[in-house]
UniProtKB/Swiss-Prot annotation:
<feature type="transmembrane region" description="Helical">
    <location>
        <begin position="229"/>
        <end position="249"/>
    </location>
</feature>
<feature type="transmembrane region" description="Helical">
    <location>
        <begin position="94"/>
        <end position="114"/>
    </location>
</feature>
<feature type="intramembrane region">
    <location>
        <begin position="196"/>
        <end position="216"/>
    </location>
</feature>
<feature type="intramembrane region">
    <location>
        <begin position="161"/>
        <end position="181"/>
    </location>
</feature>
<keyword id="KW-0378">Hydrolase</keyword>
<feature type="topological domain" description="Lumenal">
    <location>
        <begin position="58"/>
        <end position="68"/>
    </location>
</feature>
<dbReference type="Pfam" id="PF05875">
    <property type="entry name" value="Ceramidase"/>
</dbReference>
<keyword id="KW-1133">Transmembrane helix</keyword>
<keyword id="KW-0812">Transmembrane</keyword>
<keyword id="KW-0256">Endoplasmic reticulum</keyword>
<feature type="topological domain" description="Lumenal">
    <location>
        <begin position="90"/>
        <end position="93"/>
    </location>
</feature>
<feature type="topological domain" description="Cytoplasmic">
    <location>
        <begin position="115"/>
        <end position="135"/>
    </location>
</feature>
<dbReference type="GO" id="GO:0046513">
    <property type="term" value="P:ceramide biosynthetic process"/>
</dbReference>
<dbReference type="InterPro" id="IPR008901">
    <property type="entry name" value="ACER"/>
</dbReference>
<comment type="function">
    <text>Alkaline ceramidase that hydrolyzes phytoceramide and also dihydroceramide into phytosphingosine or dihydrosphingosine. Prefers phytoceramide. Also has reverse activity as acyl-CoA-independent ceramide synthase, catalyzing synthesis of phytoceramide and dihydroceramide from palmitic acid and phytosphingosine or dihydrosphingosine. Is not responsible for the breakdown of unsaturated ceramide.</text>
</comment>
<protein>
    <recommendedName>
        <fullName>Alkaline ceramidase YPC1</fullName>
        <ecNumber>3.5.1.-</ecNumber>
    </recommendedName>
</protein>
<dbReference type="GO" id="GO:0005783">
    <property type="term" value="C:endoplasmic reticulum"/>
</dbReference>
Length: 316
């Protein structure tokens, strides 16, 4: 068809990883781009997930946030790596490395928010940390519930168990964070920033979920368009499951930043931090002693903080 456009192969292409052993094989056709990567788009799009997790962890460390946020970043990074290996090989062992870390990574924000909700209910606006023993107890209960569900999933290989548990965790995190923001965040700017970051995170995540559903239910349509109209390499852009990775990777970043901001507010240490929007759209919670290295605003799509941008230019 041309140097920069070529047809999909007519028959299945063998790959270096051998026979597929995973219980799920997504709509993307296998080994059509490289014999080393079973699902090209579904693999490479995990780079968004991995990079956002790395930056989340780095930012939490550099800005002196609690270790729980380092664990959250590490957990989601592990999900990205597991998903990369799964889509690259379509092996069952890597499928588990993709799916199980999803629910275990969600345990950390679930545990954190349950503890925060208890702190808020007991102390009102004078927040004190839940005693360490109670934090451990809550974590053990959540961990046991997830471990039990994981064992059942591995035994019965019923993907509904994994998906239902993951959905329940998302609802708990979103509902608890929203309730805490509504009831206990009084500063108007902080509340606007929390709502904006949570809303964008939710919109991105839901958009990713829609892409995930479209990949499952309209696979034959996507295959037809890719083969008959787009061909390669443009066809790799029309992989809805790959867009699930991109959109959820971005959405989770937005939501983690909002959870960080909510946490410092409930601990009454928000005076030590500043919530900024890099280039007016990417949120980050930074230590007040730090000077942002990019232009930023204090609200979503708000005006740039000009005096800071001048300082940054002088430093350069």
């Amino acid at each position: 068809m041309g140097i920069f456009r070529w047809n999909y192969p007519e028959s299945s292409v063998p790959g270096v990883w051998g026979e597929t052993t995973s219980t799920i094989d997504w709509c993307e056709e296998n080994y059509v781009v490289s014999p080393y990567i079973a699902e090209w788009s579904n693999t490479l799009t995990n780079s968004v997930f991995i990079l956002s997790a790395i930056y989340t962890t780095y930012s939490a460390y550099k800005n002196k946030l609690e270790k729980r946020f380092l664990l959250i970043g590490f957990g989601y990074g592990l999900v990205g790596v597991g998903s990369w290996l799964f889509h690259m090989t379509l092996k069952y062992r890597f499928q588990l490395l993709d799916e199980l870390p999803m629910i275990y990574a969600m345990c950390i924000p679930t545990w954190s928010l349950v503890c925060e909700a208890k702190e808020a209910l007991l102390n009102g606006d004078n927040h004190k940390k839940v005693p360490l023993f109670e934090q451990i107890f809550i974590g053990v209960i959540i961990g046991l519930a997830v471990t039990t569900a994981s064992i059942l999933y591995v035994i019965y290989k019923n993907v509904d168990i994994h998906q239902i548990l993951f959905g329940v965790q998302i609802v708990v995190v979103a509902a608890t964070a929203g309730s805490l923001t509504y009831r206990y965040v009084h500063d108007p700017l902080a509340k606007r920033n929390l709502k904006a970051s949570m809303a964008l995170g939710a919109i991105l995540f839901l958009s990713g979920y829609i892409s995930w559903l479209l990949d499952i239910h309209y696979c034959s349509f996507w295959v037809h368009v890719r083969r008959s109209i787009l061909a390669l390499p443009l066809g790799v852009l029309l992989e809805p499951h790959g867009w699930w990775h991109i959109l959820t990777g971005m959405g989770i970043y937005f939501y983690i930043v909002s959870l960080e901001h909510l946490r410092v507010i409930t601990l009454n240490v928000s005076c030590n931090y500043q919530f900024i929007w890099r280039w007016k759209v990417f949120p980050e919670l930074i230590w007040k002693g730090r000077k942002p290295s990019t232009r930023y605003s204090l609200e979503l799509f708000g005006p740039y903080v000009e005096d800071q941008s001048i300082e940054v230019k002088k430093e350069k």
